[in-house]
Curated annotation (Swiss-Prot):
Reaction equation(s) it catalyzes: isopentenyl diphosphate + dimethylallyl diphosphate = (2E)-geranyl diphosphate + diphosphate; isopentenyl diphosphate + (2E)-geranyl diphosphate = (2E,6E)-farnesyl diphosphate + diphosphate
Protein name: Farnesyl pyrophosphate synthase
Name of the encoding gene: ERG20
GO MF, one example: metal ion binding
PROSITE patterns named in the record: POLYPRENYL_SYNTHASE_1 (PS00723), POLYPRENYL_SYNTHASE_2 (PS00444)
Cofactor note: Binds 2 Mg(2+) ions per subunit.
Gene Ontology biological process: ergosterol biosynthetic process; farnesyl diphosphate biosynthetic process; geranyl diphosphate biosynthetic process; isoprenoid biosynthetic process
EC number: 2.5.1.10, 2.5.1.1
Record keywords, A-Z: Isoprene biosynthesis, Lipid biosynthesis, Lipid metabolism, Magnesium, Metal-binding, Transferase
Residues annotated for Mg(2+) 2 binding in this entry: 100, 104
Pathway note: Isoprenoid biosynthesis; farnesyl diphosphate biosynthesis; farnesyl diphosphate from geranyl diphosphate and isopentenyl diphosphate: step 1/1; Isoprenoid biosynthesis; geranyl diphosphate biosynthesis; geranyl diphosphate from dimethylallyl diphosphate and isopentenyl diphosphate: step 1/1
């Protein structure tokens, strides 16, 4: 018997083939040959639906809460409308990941070769990334151009895309994999990187899109959402950094590589804030080296500095702050605190 979660995921996935068909129809309308249409369909299917789909599903879940319905109570037309916006976020994610994997020279993504590593693809993946982004605006135009919020959601996608790219830029110039310089790291910089690179598109964007469709568009309400979701997104990334270093491969489903990859993670930044001169020297000499002995030296310092305990203290403190903020939410214009509680519950004390 499929769980409620699996049934919801299945319903969401069922919308995607129609979107691929629609995007391909626009290529045919331009008179593109079959091989170009097939290539685009392959790229869309390879890069978009393979992940956890959390961002896309969040649009649907949030809209349902704002509409006082369960997801199952949404009629098909109403459901598809918000699901398309969910898929637009998944296309944005696909666009970022195809490009990121090339910049990071990654080998696999979601258990299969990265797109640029697929035979025949190579550097064509750069253009494919652009085309994944372009798909967002084709879909917004064909499904939403007659809605009063069309310009708002289009501008929101542009704005959040630019914010994410700024976060990526900061990350790339702060922590290049081949040039370790811990003097460039700081908790303030880490906060900027994760807010821009992750929080806006993964946490704020899904909720803001659902709010526009539900007719909750007052700037005060968008701000209420932002004021919880941006710090929540930062907490989510700090948790990710913590799990990469302290989680087991069985628990997180991968081997943590942040230390060897010279990542500007919360763990190293917290350690740099607290390290003695001697510990700092050891970190300078060993962080970012593709070497398990060097990695173990860094981990020993993290343990000596009790980073794990400090993370748990941080987690309790941020969760308490966010719960307090959520309890103050003004629901008089139709926004609902439950939207934010649902997000916090997904993140708090997760272990993978």
């Amino acid at each position: 018997m499929a769980s409620e979660k699996e049934i919801r995921r299945e319903r969401f996935l069922n919308v995607f083939p129609k979107l691929v068909e629609e995007l391909n129809a626009s290529l045919l309308a331009y008179g593109m040959p079959k091989e170009a249409c097939d290539w685009y369909a392959h790229s869309l299917n390879y890069n978009t639906p393979g992940g956890k789909l959390n961002r896309g599903l969040s649009v649907v879940d949030t809209y349902a809460i704002l509409s006082n319905k369960t997801v199952e109570q949404l009629g098909q037309e109403e459901y598809e409308k918000v699901a398309i916006l969910g898929w637009c976020i998944e296309l944005l994610q696909a666009y970022f990941l195809v490009a990121d994997d090339m910049m990071d020279k990654s080998i696999t993504r979601r258990g299969q070769p990265c797109w640029y590593k697929v035979p025949e693809v190579g550097e064509i993946a750069i253009n494919d990334a652009f085309m994944l982004e372009a798909a967002i605006y084709k879909l917004l135009k064909s499904h939403f151009r007659n809605e009063k919020y069309y310009i708002d959601i289009t501008e929101l996608f542009h704005e959040v895309t630019f914010q994410t790219e700024l976060g990526q830029l900061m990350d790339l110039i702060t922590a290049p994999e081949d040039k370790v310089d811990l003097s460039k790291f700081s908790l303030k910089k880490h906060s900027f990187i994760v807010t821009f690179k992750t929080a806006y598109y993964s946490f704020y964007l899904p909720v803001a899109l659902a709010m526009y469709v539900a007719g909750i568009t007052d700037e005060k309400d968008l701000k209420q959402a932002r004021d919880v979701l941006i710090p929540l997104g930062e907490y989510f990334q700090i948790q990710d950094d913590y799990l990469d270093c302290f989680g087991t491969p069985e628990q997180i489903g991968k081997i943590g590589t942040d230390i060897q990859d010279n990542k500007c993670s919360w763990v190293i930044n917290k350690a740099l804030e607290l390290a003695s001169a001697e510990q700092r020297k050891t970190l300078d000499e060993n962080y970012g080296k593709k070497d398990s002995v060097a990695e173990a030296k860094c981990k020993k310092i993290f343990n000596d500095l009790k980073i794990e305990q400090l993370y748990h203290e941080y987690e309790e403190s941020i969760a308490k702050d966010l719960k307090a903020k959520i309890s103050q939410v003004d629901e008089s214009r139709g926004f609902k605190a439950d939207v934010l509680t649902a997000f916090l519950n997904k993140v708090y004390k997760r272990s993978k």
